[in-house]
C-alpha cells in the first residue's frame, strides 16, 4: 500500500516536524594541510575592519599595531571595529543601574576563586601553544615545560601550586633580560642496515639549550598559535582558530571567571548554562515580552546574526569594561584582571606551518615555513596568495603577524556576552524614552532581539536604534543574515522556539551509535545517549526502543559479537560459540561475549555487568572482573567516566556514563611510530607526569581530598600522609608491627634522598 506522506503530519503540530528536516547525515568536512592561508585571511580582514584607526609601534617588540578605538563613526552599513569608549562605559553603567550590586558581588566571588585556584587548572584543555618548543602540545605538557623553564631561570613563586603565584612568575619573566630554554631537535643520519644491507635513515633525539633575548621571549609569550577549525558544517571555506600559550591562559581564566559570574546573574545571557536550564531561562524573557504586548502592542523577534563578531571586538574595549567593573576593588585584583586584555592588545598570530610546494616535473616537495614569507620572492605564489602575503608583510616578525585589534575565536566568550547584554539592557522604556522598547537573548556572538511597539513604524524605529547602538560598541548586526518574525517563532543557538522551545531530536543523531573506545565503554555510552534523549529531547518510548535495537545490532556488527546461537560467521564466531556452549546460564553472558541483550527502555540506567551479575556463571564472573588478567592493561576506573559526544551542531559535549571495570575495559596501545620521532621525549615527560598525578591521587582519594593549601611539595604531602595512615592502621590493628616499621623506614629513606638531591 502506498502511504501519502502528508498523512503522517495530520496529527503532528507543525513545530514537531522539525526533526524531519535534518540535513547533516554523513561526516562533517575536515581540513587538511596548512592553515597559514586562513590565518592570513583573519589577520588581513581584522585590519581591514579597523583600517581607519591609528597606527603605533610597540616599543618592546617593534610590532606595528592598529588601534581603532574611538575611531570615526560609521557612515554606511559595512562592518567596522570602531568602538567608542564612552559608549561602552555608559552601557556598563546602565547595566549596573538595572542590576544593583552585580559587579561588586561578582568581583567578590572572583577574588575568592583567584586566591584558591591551583595551577593545575591550566592542565585542562587540549592543544596548547608551547612557547618552549614553538608548537602545539597537550595542555599538561605545555604547562610542565613552562614551569620547568621558569624554575631553571630562577622563577620559583609557582612552587606554592597556586595559579596566582604562577602568574607572578609570568609577570617577572617578562622583565628578564633573557630566558634560557631547552629545545628538542632531531638528528638524521644515513647508515647501512646490517641485515638488509640497504641504507636507512636513523633518527636520534637531542636536547639543546637556547637563550632567548627579551624581545624574542615577549614575542613568544604573546603568541597565539593558529589551526584550522575542523568539522564545521554548512560552510564552503574553512577558518582559523587560535590557541594561546601558558602565559596568557591563566589571566584569561580569571577574566572569564569574573564575566561568567556576571552572566549567571543576567537573565538575557545564554551562557554559562546549557540544555534545559538555558531553555527555561530564555523562555522567561520571551514570556515577559509577550505578556506585555498582548493588548495594544505589536511584538516582533529578530533571529540575529552578527558579522565577524570577534574580528570587530577589541581587547582595549575589554580593558575599559574591566576597569569599570572592578573600579572599587583592591589594586592587586584590578591589575591581575587587566593583564589579559593588555596582552591581547599586543598579541601576535603565529602563521602556522607555512606553504607546501610541489614541482611536478622534478617530483620534489618543499615546505616554505611561515618565517620565510617575509622575504621570499612572490613569483612562486598564485594571485590570491600573493595579495595576502603582500598585505600581511608589514606586520610580520619572526613568522608571526602582529594582530592588535580583534579577539580570535573563543577567547572571551563570557565577557563579550556581557557587552552584548548591556546593549539589550538599554531597550527598557526608561532608557528609550519613546513608545518602542526591546529585550532579547545573547550568547557569545549569537542573539535574538524582541522588539515591542504600538505599530510597524515603531518596530522599524526600534530595530534601527538597536542597530546603531550596537555599532557604537563594535557589534555589527548583519542585515543580510538576520530575519524578523512575529514573536513566537525564532531560532537562538540552534534552539528553535515556537510557542516554547521545540525539541529537535535530530540534532542528536550523530551521537547515536558505537563510539569505538572499547566494548565496555561503548555499551555504556550507547544506552546512556538513548536514556538522555528520552529525558531531554522528546525521544518517545517506541522510537527509543527501536533506537536501542538498532544500537545493539550496530554494536554486534562492530565488535563481531553476534549471539552464540546465531548463524552469522565472523572471525570471532568460533570462540564465542565455544563460550556459549560451555556456559550454563547463557543470559549472564555480556552482549560483547555473544550473550543476549537484556536492555529495554526501563533499565537503561543500569550498567550491563550489574544488570546480568546475578545471572552469570561463577567462573565467568571470576574471569570478567579479574584485575590480574594479564591481557588487559587497566585504566584506573572511576565510578563515572566522561565521554565526548558529537551533536550535529555546536561543540562536542561531555557526557557522563557509568563505568564498571571489567576485562572488556581495555585501552589500545599507543601507535609505535611516535616513539621514533622528536615527540618521544615529550611522550615520556607526559607519562611521568601522569604517573606522578596517579600516585598522588592514590594517597589522597577523592573522598578525603582537600586540596593542600600549604607550601609543601607533592612528595612531602604524600610522605606525611603515608605516616598518618600507617599510624592509624597500626593502632587499629589493621597492619602488623613489622609492616608499620617498614613503612616508616621507606618514608625516612625518601626524605633522605630528597635532602641529598
From Swiss-Prot:
It is found in: Host nucleus; Host cytoplasm. Residues 55-64 have a biased composition (Polar residues). Keywords: Eukaryotic host gene expression shutoff by virus, Eukaryotic host transcription shutoff by virus, Host cytoplasm, Host gene expression shutoff by virus, Host nucleus, Host-virus interaction, Inhibition of host RNA polymerase II by virus, Nucleotide-binding, Nucleotidyltransferase, Phosphoprotein, RNA-directed RNA polymerase, Transferase, Viral RNA replication, Viral transcription. GO terms for molecular function: nucleotide binding; RNA binding; RNA-directed RNA polymerase activity. Residues 286-483 form the RdRp catalytic domain. Residues 249-256 are annotated as: Promoter-binding site. Residues 50-82 are annotated as: Disordered. A motif (Nuclear localization signal) lies at residues 187-195, 203-216. Phosphorylated by host PRKCA. Its main location: host cell. Its EC number is 2.7.7.48. RNA-dependent RNA polymerase which is responsible for replication and transcription of virus RNA segments. The transcription of viral mRNAs occurs by a unique mechanism called cap-snatching. 5' methylated caps of cellular mRNAs are cleaved after 10-13 nucleotides by PA. In turn, these short capped RNAs are used as primers by PB1 for transcription of viral mRNAs. During virus replication, PB1 initiates RNA synthesis and copy vRNA into complementary RNA (cRNA) which in turn serves as a template for the production of more vRNAs. Influenza RNA polymerase is composed of three subunits: PB1, PB2 and PA. Interacts (via N-terminus) with PA (via C-terminus). Interacts (via C-terminus) with PB2 (via N-terminus); this interaction is essential for transcription initiation. Belongs to the influenza viruses polymerase PB1 family. This is RNA-directed RNA polymerase catalytic subunit.
Amino acid at each position: 500500500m502506498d502511504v501519502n506522506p502528508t498523512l503522517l503530519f495530520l496529527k503532528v503540530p507543525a513545530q514537531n516536524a522539525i526533526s524531519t528536516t535534518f540535513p547533516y547525515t554523513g561526516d562533517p568536512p575536515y581540513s587538511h594541510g596548512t592553515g597559514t592561508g586562513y590565518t592570513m585571511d583573519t589577520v588581513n580582514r581584522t585590519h581591514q575592519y579597523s583600517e581607519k584607526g591609528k597606527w603605533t609601534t610597540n616599543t618592546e617588540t617593534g610590532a606595528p599595531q592598529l588601534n581603532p578605538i574611538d575611531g570615526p563613526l560609521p557612515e554606511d552599513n559595512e562592518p567596522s571595529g570602531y568602538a567608542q569608549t564612552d559608549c561602552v562605559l555608559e552601557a556598563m553603567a546602565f547595566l549596573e543601574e538595572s542590576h544593583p550590586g552585580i559587579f561588586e558581588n561578582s568581583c567578590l566571588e572572583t577574588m575568592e576563586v583567584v586566591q584558591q585556584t591551583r595551577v593545575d587548572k591550566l592542565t585542562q584543555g587540549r592543544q596548547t601553544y608551547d612557547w618552549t618548543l614553538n608548537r602545539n602540545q597537550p595542555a599538561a605538557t605545555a604547562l610542565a615545560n613552562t614551569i620547568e623553564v621558569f624554575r631553571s631561570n630562577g622563577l620559583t613563586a609557582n612552587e606554592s601550586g597556586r595559579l596566582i603565584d604562577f602568574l607572578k612568575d609570568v609577570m617577572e619573566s617578562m622583565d628578564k633580560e633573557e630566558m634560557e630554554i631547552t629545545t628538542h631537535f632531531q638528528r638524521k643520519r644515513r647508515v647501512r642496515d646490517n641485515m638488509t644491507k640497504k641504507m636507512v635513515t636513523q633518527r636520534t633525539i637531542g636536547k639543546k639549550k637556547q637563550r632567548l633575548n627579551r624581545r624574542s621571549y615577549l614575542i613568544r609569550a604573546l603568541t597565539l598559535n593558529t589551526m584550522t577549525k575542523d568539522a564545521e558544517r554548512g560552510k564552503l571555506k574553512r577558518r582559523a582558530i587560535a590557541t594561546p600559550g601558558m602565559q596568557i591562559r591563566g589571566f584569561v581564566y580569571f577574566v572569564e571567571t569574573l564575566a561568567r559570574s556576571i552572566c549567571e546573574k543576567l537573565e538575557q545571557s545564554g551562557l554559562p548554562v546549557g540544555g534545559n536550564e538555558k531553555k527555561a531561562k530564555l523562555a522567561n524573557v520571551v514570556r515577559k515580552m509577550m505578556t506585555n504586548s498582548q493588548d495594544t502592542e505589536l511584538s516582533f523577534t529578530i533571529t540575529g546574526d552578527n558579522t565577524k563578531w570577534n574580528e570587530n571586538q577589541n581587547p582595549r574595549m575589554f580593558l575599559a569594561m574591566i576597569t569599570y567593573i572592578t573600579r572599587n576593588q583592591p589594586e592587586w585584583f584590578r591589575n591581575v584582571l587587566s593583564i589579559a586584555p593588555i596582552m591581547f592588545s599586543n598579541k601576535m598570530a603565529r602563521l602556522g606551518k607555512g606553504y607546501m610546494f610541489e614541482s611536478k616535473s622534478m617530483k620534489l616537495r618543499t615546505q616554505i615555513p611561515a618565517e620565510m614569507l617575509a622575504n621570499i620572492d612572490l613569483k612562486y605564489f598564485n594571485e590570491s596568495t600573493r595579495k595576502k602575503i603582500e598585505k600581511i608583510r608589514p606586520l610580520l616578525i619572526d613568522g608571526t603577524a602582529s594582530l592588535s585589534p580583534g579577539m580570535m575565536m573563543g577567547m572571551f566568550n563570557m565577557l563579550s556576552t556581557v557587552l552584548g547584554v548591556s546593549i539589550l539592557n538599554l531597550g527598557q522604556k526608561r532608557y528609550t524614552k519613546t513608545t518602542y522598547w526591546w529585550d532579547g537573548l545573547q550568547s557569545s556572538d549569537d542573539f535574538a532581539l524582541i522588539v515591542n511597539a504600538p505599530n510597524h513604524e515603531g518596530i522599524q524605529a526600534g530595530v534601527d536604534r538597536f542597530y546603531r547602538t550596537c555599532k557604537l560598541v563594535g557589534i555589527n548586526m548583519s542585515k543580510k543574515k538576520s530575519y524578523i518574525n512575529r514573536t513566537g517563532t525564532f531560532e537562538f543557538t540552534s534552539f528553535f522556539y515556537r510557542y516554547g522551545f521545540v525539541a529537535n531530536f535530530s540534532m542528536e543523531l550523530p551521537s547515536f551509535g558505537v563510539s569505538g573506545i572499547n566494548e565496555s565503554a561503548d555499551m555504556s555510552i550507547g544506552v546512556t545517549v538513548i536514556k538522555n534523549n528520552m529525558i531531554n529531547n522528546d525521544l518517545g518510548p517506541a522510537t527509543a526502543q527501536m533506537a536501542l535495537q538498532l544500537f545493539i545490532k550496530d554494536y554486534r556488527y562492530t565488535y563481531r559479537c553476534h549471539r552464540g546461537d546465531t548463524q552469522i560467521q565472523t572471525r570471532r564466531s568460533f570462540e564465542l560459540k565455544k563460550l556459549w556452549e560451555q556456559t550454563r546460564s547463557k543470559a549472564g553472558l555480556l552482549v560483547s561475549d555473544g550473550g543476549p541483550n537484556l536492555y529495554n527502555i526501563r533499565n537503561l540506567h543500569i550498567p550491563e555487568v550489574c544488570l546480568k551479575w546475578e545471572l552469570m556463571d561463577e567462573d565467568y564472573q571470576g574471569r570478567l572482573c579479574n584485575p590480574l588478567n594479564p591481557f588487559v592493561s587497566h585504566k584506573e576506573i572511576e565510578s563515572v567516566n566522561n565521554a565526548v559526544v558529537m551533536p550535529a551542531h555546536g561543540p562536542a559535549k561531555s557526557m557522563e556514563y557509568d563505568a564498571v571495570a571489567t576485562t572488556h575495559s581495555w585501552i589500545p596501545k599507543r601507535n609505535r611510530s611516535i616513539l621514533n620521532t622528536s615527540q618521544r621525549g615529550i611522550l615520556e615527560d607526559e607519562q611521568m607526569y601522569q604517573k606522578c598525578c596517579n600516585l598522588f591521587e592514590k594517597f589522597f582519594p577523592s573522598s578525603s581530598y582537600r586540596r593542600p593549601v600549604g607550601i609543601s611539595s607533592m612528595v612531602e604531602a604524600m610522605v606525611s600522609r603515608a605516616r598518618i595512615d600507617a599510624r592509624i592502621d597500626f593502632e587499629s590493628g589493621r597492619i602488623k608491627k613489622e609492616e608499620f616499621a617498614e613503612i616508616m623506614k621507606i618514608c625516612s629513606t625518601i626524605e633522605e634522598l630528597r635532602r641529598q638531591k
